[in-house]
Structure formats: C-alpha cells, structure tokens
Amino acid sequence: MFSWLGTDDRRRKDPEVFQTVSEGLKKLYKSKLLPLEEHYRFHEFHSPALEDADFDNKPMVLLVGQYSTGKTTFIRYLLEQDFPGMRIGPEPTTDSFIAVMQGDMEGIIPGNALVVDPKKPFRKLNAFGNAFLNRFVCAQLPNPVLESISVIDTPGILSGEKQRISRGYDFAAVLEWFAERVDRIILLFDAHKLDISDEFSEVIKALKNHEDKMRVVLNKADQIETQQLMRVYGALMWSLGKIVNTPEVIRVYIGSFWSHPLLIPDNRKLFEAEEQDLFRDIQSLPRNAALRKLNDLIKRARLAKVHAYIISSLKKEMPSVFGKDNKKKELVNNLAEIYGRIEREHQISPGDFPNLKRMQDQLQAQDFSKFQPLKSKLLEVVDDMLAHDIAQLMVLVRQEESQRPIQMVKGGAFEGTLHGPFGHGYGEGAGEGIDDAEWVVARDKPMYDEIFYTLSPVDGKITGANAKKEMVRSKLPNSVLGKIWKLADIDKDGMLDDDEFALANHLIKVKLEGHELPNELPAHLLPPSKRKVAE
C-alpha cells in the first residue's frame, strides 16, 4: 500500500550516477533546475537558460578596464603573437567585444554568425540585438595558450554620458552576462594615470556578485618610481574599497605586461614575482573549471529558489478581479517587506536575494496575473539536487582534478618563465651557484669554520645541542631550523661536521634573505666530501 511513496523516497536518497562532471551538470540543470526557472519566468528577470556549450566550453578570462589600460596588449603578451582584429594605441582602439579562441586557421567570425553556432557558448547574446552583435566578433587562431583557455577582450570604458549612450546597447548588462560565464575577471588599471570614472565604477558594481572571480592588475607600473608606485597602489586600494563592498581585499597584481624593456627597472624583481603569481592563477583555471561550473550552478539554483518565492508571493497578494493596478504598485513599492517576510519564513540568507532596485524596475513591466502560485514539488526537486546530487558530483570533481596536471596552460608567455636561466628564481636563494664549478658554500666557509671550532668539536663533529646554541641566534622559528638541520645532516648521524655546519649556515642565510627553503637538498649544495655518500 502507498508503494509510490517509498519509490519517491528511494529516488530522493539515491543520487544519480554520472560519468563526467560536465555530463552531470547538463542533466541536473535540464531535469531539475530548468523546470523551476521556466515556471517562474526566471529568464526574463535574471539570466537566459543555459545550453550544452555553457558546460562544455574551455575556461574563459574576461578583461575589463578603461581605454588604453593595456587590455589588448596584455592578451598579445600572453599569446606572444598578434590576433585577428587586434588594434593597439593610446586612443580608444578596441571598439568591439573580441572573443579570442583556438582555431585551425586565423580568421574572424562576425557576431551574427557566432550566435547561431551551437558549439560556441554565445547563442544567448542575440538578446542584445544587432547594435551589440555588430560590435562582437570571435578572433580564431592556432596558439598553444588558447588550447586551454579563451580570452574576452572588451571595449575600453569611456567617461561621459554621450559615449555611454551612443554604444546602442546595454554595456553593463553585456559585461554581466559574460561575468556569469567566465572563470576569471581581470580588471586592468593604468598605474601611470590612475582614474576610475563613474562609468567604470558602475561596471564594477554590476559585477559585484562575482567578486570571487575578480583579480586586479595595476599595469604599466614600470613608468613610475617606487615611491610614486606605493602612492598609486594605496590610492587604488582606497578607491576599490569604496566600490567593492567586501570585507576581503581583492588581489592586486603589479607589473608591466608587455614585451618591451622596462622604462624604470627598479622594481624588476617585484614585477617578476607578481607576474608569476598571476600566471599561476591563470594556469589553475583549467584544473578548477569543473568546480567553477558546479559553483555557478549552485549559485544559480539558490537565486532561482528565491525568485520562485518572490513571484509566488506577489501572485498570492494580487486580487482576482478589481484594483489590480493599484495593488501592483503597492506590492512593487513594498518589495523590501516581501523580501523580509520570505527571508524569515524560509530561513534564506539576505545575500541570496536579487538586487531590490533592479527587481522593482523589472516588475513594473510585468503582468502579475501571469505569475504562478507556489509549486512545492518543483522546489523540492531543486532542494534534493542541492542536498544529494551536488554532493555526488563533488566527489567526481575531485577525481577529475586529481587526474589533471597541475599546470595545463602552456605556450606563449607561460613557456618563457618555466625553463632555463630566465625561469623565475633561477640562480637565487637555494639555487645560487647552480651553474658554478665550485661549491657555492666554500665562499663563506672560512667564516663558518671559525664559529665551528669554538663549539668544541669531537672527532671533527659537533653535537646537535652545540649546533642548536649557534643556530637559534638567527631567531628563526624552531620549525624552520628543524628543516635546515634535516637538510644539512646529510649522513643522518645526529651531528654536524665542518662542511655540514657550513651548509646549515648557508641555508640560514638563504632563509634570512627572504627565500624559501627547498624540500630536498639540491645537488649543487651537496658538499664535495659528501657527494659519494649521497650517491
């Protein structure tokens, strides 16, 4: 009796099994989330329906900034080659959105042709009309960097009302559409002329739901002296603090991202370190792409649930016959109270609600009589997806991540800093002396020997206790000194001879100069007397 109840329970408890994360996301979206979105007209308010290409596409990087901040030059620097449609200059040059993607041959696909290609994730952009599509192209070219990621170049954000209106399409809305679908948003600022216009501020605010994807690049930093750079950096952080309302500080990378000589080379080491950090962040995108798509689907599901509660509440409050227009105005004006009631009744976080002002503007143009009442079954299916199916997919995400190499983006600028003497940190810190014929520690060994013979060596060795008295003078923490001891005690006898003691002091010097210690002792640091022992 009532066997259907048991079947429904079993279905809820046993999540679906998927072969890949991409396949799982597609099936969950189409079977569980899309029906809720369509029932409550989610796509008219927030975001168009997702398609297969949205789940299958490569990670995308969106570049945003005012004109002449170096967005197009940054892409050229990454690729180490020109791309079709590229224009660079001090004036506003890029007047189109350019999707730079991998292709067998160099060429440009115009926007109207691009939005009908089911293999590209841009089909829903046709909603922005011809004014936008005439300013949207895809630049295809064969490049090893583009085998792993795609890059979206955007028009420079201009100051002034005329420039904003004359675009003919909603620039902020287009950027928001891209922001939902990309893996990384890079905001570029020019260190030489730092200025955040009102239009740029509005764009950054429009991207506020995607702070986790945002990174900031302070470009052209080689054009100013160190003292000025500190002031510019401080001014940028202060300005961003007023625009981006998050307690966390957005990561800012300082550098000069082009292939020309540095104008003021004082901060070369800083620029190199910052460039490596940014490259590592971009290189992590393919590895984390599945997790990002899963995260975006969860975010979308939470918004769709809240949207369903809002629409059904408005439907419930509407009279069936008379006074509909007045009631509609009253409900729109009192939307904040409806938000508060839904928040209390359903224990929903305030951060899950859509922007109040924007929602009120959108509701003005809607016919409330066409809204649907609350359908619990649709919400239960989405809750079940979030509670069970997503957990199952998380396991699959970890499996896929573990099978991928750590650095997947290859070629272009990423290749030049990996190998040889121009690799980051080559010949510095523990790598100093890597190409020398002589043991690098031998330079300072006479000084270390003087200390060694004051520590009462027995049979040419000092005890761990005596070595510790000397090593703690460096004021390094015990955890660091313990690692140095482990690296220096090559024969593992718990004592140090003069070569091992000199090596320990060399490693202390490396650490005090701000470099990281290696996990294993490099071959060039092995004392000549110990090289046969190590073999």
Swiss-Prot record:
CDD domains: EH (cd00052), EHD (cd09913). The modification Phosphoserine is found at S349, S456. ATP binds at G65, Q66, Y67, S68, T69, G70, K71, T72, K220, W258. Residues 65-72 are annotated as: G1 motif. It is found in: Recycling endosome membrane; Cell membrane; Cell projection, Cilium membrane. This is EH domain-containing protein 3. The lineage of its organism: Eukaryota, Metazoa, Chordata, Craniata, Vertebrata. Transmembrane segments: none annotated. Highly expressed in heart and brain and moderately expressed in kidney, liver, and placenta. Residues 91-92 are annotated as: G2 motif. The EH domain interacts with Asn-Pro-Phe (NPF) motifs of target proteins. Belongs to the TRAFAC class dynamin-like GTPase superfamily. Dynamin/Fzo/YdjA family. EHD subfamily. Ca(2+) binds at D489, D491, D493, M495, E500. Keywords: Acetylation, ATP-binding, Calcium, Cell membrane, Cell projection, Cilium, Cilium biogenesis/degradation, Coiled coil, Endosome, Isopeptide bond, Membrane, Metal-binding, Nucleotide-binding, Phosphoprotein, Protein transport, Transport, Ubl conjugation. One of its GO terms (molecular function) is ATP binding. The modification N-acetylmethionine is found at M1. The keyword Coiled coil applies.
